[in-house]
Amino acid sequence: ATLPSTAMPVETTTQVPKGRDGFVQHLSGTAERVAQESGIPASFMLGQAGHETGWGKSEIKTANGGNSFNLFGIKAGKGWTGKVAEITTTEYINGTPRKVVAKFRAYDSYEDSFRDYAKLITDNPRYEKAQATAKTGSAVAYAAELQKAGYATDPEYAKKLSGAINSALRVQRAQA
């Protein structure tokens, strides 16, 4: 039986397993679908989602304790009209880690999160170089360009992200 086109695959709304291998396995189908449309390799998105959530251990929760489905730590800026989740997070201000309260985007599914991330990277001129490096397949170059463009405030972000991307890639290869 085929799903109606409006039905979401189950992995897009069920809680993601905690831990790298289960996390990657659970979200690979979603990442592959979005990669086909966006040109951003699935392993890059899985690695970034894994890094941002501690491989599913620390997902952003909504005020009522529900899942925000925000795998990428995307903030809800002035232009965001969707749902939000407000949490305390660590931001690096002048190189010093500080706890701040910030609003993050909230989604209806993990697929929505992947699609919004891909849209952010492909549509925002700030990430033009990152998008170009994604096509080369270099996790190190992609992570470096995201950091240069200001995706995160952590001064070690590129190093941590490229490690997470390569880790996701190893899991994907082992599961293939």
Q: Where in this protein do the model-derived segments appear?
A:
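Catalytic cores of secreted/periplasmic lytic hydrolases that degrade extracellular macromolecules
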Residues: 1-176
